[in-house]
A protein has these predicted regions:
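Conserved helicase motor core of SF1/SF2 NTP-dependent helicases
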Residues: 2-13, 22-36, 42-161, 165-215
Length: 215
């Protein structure tokens, strides 16, 4: 898994010396983080370069290969550089064959929080819990369930779809057509951990369809 050089030490110093209480302070402190990545494999480096040069990137790989960490690290770095207005996090919330949030208590964010822990854990390691909380509270980092994307055009956003192996072909098609002006998409998943049949996986279908396509 990829790690930022001296990542824990750098974040601990920034976090302890400069507590923040608002979005402006949080974003200002992001600029002071040393954004250096130590790639652990050529595949990780290739993934990073692909994100850098394309508006939409698909990545399939096993758990622990660093795809989620690299995705959120890149997104947070771009946010620190003010390249995008905000970060959108999404997953297909598969439960017994479909997205069923209605029976869970709380609002949408509370319902989806257990599904988004992989995002939050990695982001906390990079920018600290306090800054993450402020950026979430101000919708600078926002969670939108994949099923709720229909009809939304996402402009000036950095969007990460994880666990995409559980999205159907129709959901992936709907998702990629939501991209607006000056936005970047990363779509990741593990085809060996799909909760739906592999031939129905939108990620599997998209990788086959878009193999060799750049842009």
């Amino acid at each position: 898994m990829a790690r930022a050089k001296s990542r824990v030490k750098t974040i601990t110093q920034v976090k302890s010396e400069q507590p923040c209480s608002n979005k402006r302070q949080a974003l200002s402190q992001l600029k002071r983080i040393k954004w250096n990545i130590d790639f652990r494999s050529e595949n990780q480096h290739h993934f990073w370069k692909t994100i850098d040069t394309n508006d939409i990137t698909f990545c399939a790989g096993p758990a622990g290969c660093g795809k989620t960490f690299l995705s959120v690290y890149y997104a947070l770095q771009m946010l620190a550089q003010k390249k995008y207005e905000s970060i959108i996090l999404t997953k297909p919330l598969v439960e017994a064959g479909g997205e069923k949030l209605g029976f869970l208590p709380g609002d949408v964010e509370e319902k989806t929080a257990p599904f988004m822990m992989s995002f939050y854990y990695n982001m906390e390691q990079i920018i600290g819990k306090q800054r993450l909380g402020i950026l979430k509270d101000t919708n600078t980092i926002q969670v939108i369930p994949l099923a709720f994307m229909r009809g939304i055009t996402l402009s000036n956003k950095f969007v990460i779809l994880d666990e995409a192996q559980n999205a159907t072909t129709e959901q992936i098609k709907m998702f990629v057509t939501r991209i607006g002006e000056h936005s970047k998409y990363i779509i990741t998943g593990d085809l060996d951990q799909s909760d739906i049949q592999k031939h129905k996986s939108g990620l599997n279908d998209a990788i086959k369809r878009f193999a060799g396509v750049h842009g």
